[in-house]
Amino acid sequence: MSNEISRNWPAPAKLNLFLHINGRRADGYHELQTLFQFIDCCDQLDFRVTQTPELILHSNMSAVVADSDNLILRAAKSLQQATSYPGGAEIWLEKRLPMGGGLGGGSSDAATTLVALNQLWNTQLSNDELAAIGLKLGADIPVFIRGFAAFAEGVGERLQAVTPTEFWYLVIAPDAHVSTAAVFQDPLLPRNTPKLGIDTLMSQPWANDCQDLVVSKYPQVAKALGWLLEYAPSRMTGTGACVFGEFSSQQQALAALAKLPSDMQGFVAKGMNISPLIVRLTHP
C-alpha cells in the first residue's frame, strides 16, 4: 500500500442557475426544481492512504479542522463503514471557496473525498453507490459525485444531465452568513411555484425563489446584487449569500470585476458542464 500523497483533487463550486420551491413535504423537506452548473473555482484536496483506520484532516482554515462534524471526515468514515475498508487516510484541504455562500463548497469537498478515496482505497463502488452514501450526508452531494450539470428535482437528488450555456460569471461573496435552515423555515418564503417540465424551464427566464426573502433581510446581499445587475443578468445562488452575473466573455466579466467597489469581494469563473473532478478522475 503506497504512502505517496495523491494530489490535486478538485472540489468545484456550483451555481444554481435557477431554484424553484414547489412545496413542503410531510417530513419538513422542500420539493425543489433547480439547475446545477459547476464553475472552475475549486477547493483542492490531497490524500495519503494509511494502514491504520484513523482519518486525519489538515486544512489552511482552522475552523474546518476544528469542526468535528466536518463533512469530509463524515464522508470518509461513511465510505469506510460501507466497504469495511480496514485502512484510513490523511487528508489535506486547501479551502479557496467562500464558506456558507450557496456555492456548495462543503458538499463538493465531501463528494471529492468519496470519489478520490473510492479510487485510492480500491473499494470499487459505483457512482450510484457513492451517490447514495453522499445523499445521506447532504442533498447537494450526488450532483458533485456524478459530475455533470444537471436539472434536479425532489430534494435535489433526482438528476437529469443538461447542457446549459457555459457563460463566464462574476461571483460576488457578500460579507454575510445566510442560514439555509432559517431561509427554508421562514414563513415568507414562496413555496408554491408550479412544477414545470424541463423543456419549459430551460427556455424561460430563470429566477431563484429564495432571492427576494434573502435580499430583504441581508442588506449586503441586496447591495451586491443591485451593483451586479447594472452590468449583467444576475441572480443569487442557493440560499445565498453569493450572487453571480452572466457574461458572454471572460474579458467582459473581468472588466466588471475591475470596477467592483472596494468593500466587495468577487472573482471571475467559467461555467462548466463537466466537473473538473471527472477530468481529474479520468486524466490523473
Curated annotation (Swiss-Prot):
It catalyses: 4-CDP-2-C-methyl-D-erythritol + ATP = 4-CDP-2-C-methyl-D-erythritol 2-phosphate + ADP + H(+). InterPro entries: GHMP_kinase_C_dom, GHMP_kinase_C_sf, GHMP_kinase_N_dom, IspE, Ribosomal_Su5_D2-typ_SF, Ribsml_uS5_D2-typ_fold_subgr. Belongs to the GHMP kinase family. IspE subfamily. GO terms for molecular function: 4-(cytidine 5'-diphospho)-2-C-methyl-D-erythritol kinase activity; ATP binding. Pathway: Isoprenoid biosynthesis; isopentenyl diphosphate biosynthesis via DXP pathway; isopentenyl diphosphate from 1-deoxy-D-xylulose 5-phosphate: step 3/6. Catalyzes the phosphorylation of the position 2 hydroxy group of 4-diphosphocytidyl-2C-methyl-D-erythritol. It holds the Pfam family GHMP_kinases_N. The active site is at K14, D140. Keywords: ATP-binding, Isoprene biosynthesis, Kinase, Nucleotide-binding, Transferase. ATP binds at P98, M99, G100, G101, G102, L103, G104, G105, G106, S107, S108. It comes from the Bacteria. Its EC number is 2.7.1.148. GO terms for biological process: isopentenyl diphosphate biosynthetic process, methylerythritol 4-phosphate pathway; terpenoid biosynthetic process. The keyword ATP-binding applies. This is 4-diphosphocytidyl-2-C-methyl-D-erythritol kinase.
